[in-house]
């Protein structure tokens, strides 16, 4: 963890902290580190023991849509580093399973699978860990970007589509689907399919999402069945 320079931003006030440029660090990496240090949600996440600022995003989404409850079964796609799972457990969910390519430190009582969700057999293994149909499928999956706008867009759309197809295949009636998206990052075809299977489909941008980011969340509620 990178610590801000002593006295550089005491009490969250004053001038933003600046880091000395480390050898081998690119300008974009430097900017990202400085943004993390000065971001109030990142600082709050560290103070409260959450693994990422994304915990506040799912908190706001749940405050509005009320997904998490003691009896709910929840699947988290792209669950690293575990912030969404932390909030789900904190709000009473006891049956949940997460999957990610990256290793995730335990978040009891969640079952964790270190695997590519798009790999053969991954969805089946995840459902087996959960022990039944989920009430909520949530996806924070994001592709590795290559810097080519059209290619990155197609990768984003592809992951949203995969997550949506999975949700439609496995959800209980009345269930819900939440996925990270980007403005203009999903096709009319995906939205149309979700509208055929859910009572309501909408976009939601939490305050914890950076305002200069195109990040939004696709929220589909009232699953009508396959």
UniProtKB/Swiss-Prot annotation:
Give the binding site residues for S-adenosyl-L-methionine: 82, 84, 100, 116, 140
**Chief site of localization:** cytoplasm
Q: InterPro entries given for it? A: RNA_methyltr_RlmE (IPR050082), RNA_MeTrfase_FtsJ_dom (IPR002877), rRNA-MeTfrase_E (IPR015507), SAM-dependent_MTases_sf (IPR029063)
GO cellular component, as recorded? cytoplasm
Q: Which GO terms describe its molecular function?
A: rRNA (uridine-2'-O-)-methyltransferase activity
Q: Where in the cell is it found?
A: Cytoplasm
Q: Which UniProt keywords apply?
A: Cytoplasm, Methyltransferase, rRNA processing, S-adenosyl-L-methionine, Transferase
Gene3D superfamilies in alphabetical order: Vaccinia Virus protein VP39
**Which segments carry the region annotation Disordered?**
1-25
List the catalytic activities from the record: uridine(2552) in 23S rRNA + S-adenosyl-L-methionine = 2'-O-methyluridine(2552) in 23S rRNA + S-adenosyl-L-homocysteine + H(+)
What is the active site of this protein? 180
Q: What is its EC number?
A: 2.1.1.166
Identify the Pfam families for this entry: FtsJ
Q: Which family does it belong to?
A: Belongs to the class I-like SAM-binding methyltransferase superfamily. RNA methyltransferase RlmE family.
Give the function comment from the record.
Specifically methylates the uridine in position 2552 of 23S rRNA at the 2'-O position of the ribose in the fully assembled 50S ribosomal subunit.
Any idea what this protein is called?
Ribosomal RNA large subunit methyltransferase E
- State the species of origin: Caulobacter vibrioides (strain ATCC 19089 / CIP 103742 / CB 15) (Caulobacter crescentus)
